[in-house]
Regions:
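Short Pro-Cys-Gly-centered "Cys-loop" motif that presents a nucleophilic cysteine in a tight turn
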Residues: 1-57, 66-235
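Glycine/serine-rich anion-binding loops at beta->alpha junctions
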Residues: 60
Length: 235
């Protein structure tokens, strides 16, 4: 399925991911991850990108974020990943690309916000690295379960309004449907919004673009050909 030009929706959650170039281990040690998290904290706060959740793996990263300004997502990742690439190349006496292309992202409705956050925090569990999400120290799960400090610029307000440690533990323990995992991956890869038909229709009306997958025939022409569509919704 073709990848859409990126859609950034102010005050709407997004799932975001990016891999290391050639899937190389760019976050292999605790020292590298600490450098990365310090940069991430700096730039999400500077550019007003609310960080609701994250997970750092050895060769890729996942986030659930809410941009509070039109360029918050692009600038935060551009500067975090640019500065980290300079650090990593210097530390490894290397040169060239550290990150694989541009990041992937998709807007989320209110239900899929939590589905995506669960998906992000269960990443190390699916990979067989830990038995429970909170055992992985380099994700937001540690803060959500009270075993780590939200020192990465993590925005806990929305999570606290909806969850407690006990209810979040139950939600993660309930597991993920394969259909949910597939939907998150597909929408993130293509850039299509993940949500109800009503949610997607709202975004289509605002962007003047066809965002729902077409059912065969000739593909519809986008009505807005900008590289990135920026919307603003009320908080």
């Amino acid at each position: 399925m073709a990848r859409l030009s990126r859609i950034v929706v102010v005050n709407i959650p997004h799932h975001v991911t990016q891999r290391g170039n050639a899937r190389q281990f760019i976050l292999a040690g605790d020292g590298e991850r600490l450098v990365y998290l310090n940069l991430l904290r700096k730039y999400v706060q500077l550019h007003e990108l609310s960080l609701l959740g994250y997970c750092l793996m050895s060769n890729h990263v996942h986030f659930v974020v809410v941009p509070r300004k039109p360029d918050a997502l692009a600038l935060s990742l551009k500067q975090t990943h640019g500065r980290y690439a300079s650090y990593w190349n210097a530390a490894h006496r290397s040169s060239g690309h550290v990150w694989q292309g541009r990041f992937y992202s998709c807007p989320l409705d209110s239900y899929h916000l939590w589905v995506a956050l669960r998906y992000v925090e269960l990443n190390p569990v699916r990979a067989g690295l830990v038995a429970e999400a909170e055992s992985w120290p380099r994700s937001s799960a540690a803060a959500h379960f009270g075993s780590g400090e939200p020192d990465t610029g993590l925005d806990m307000e929305m999570w606290r309004m909806r969850w407690s440690m006990e209810t979040w533990r139950e939600y993660l323990a309930a597991g993920e449907a394969e259909s949910e995992i597939a939907a998150i991956r597909q929408c993130t890869h293509t850039g299509r919004p993940l949500g109800t038909p009503e949610f997607i229709y709202t975004l289509e009306q605002a962007t003047l673009r066809r965002l729902a997958p077409q059912k065969g025939g000739r593909p519809g022409h986008a009505m807005d050909h900008r590289a990135q569509a920026i919307l603003a919704f009320e908080k």
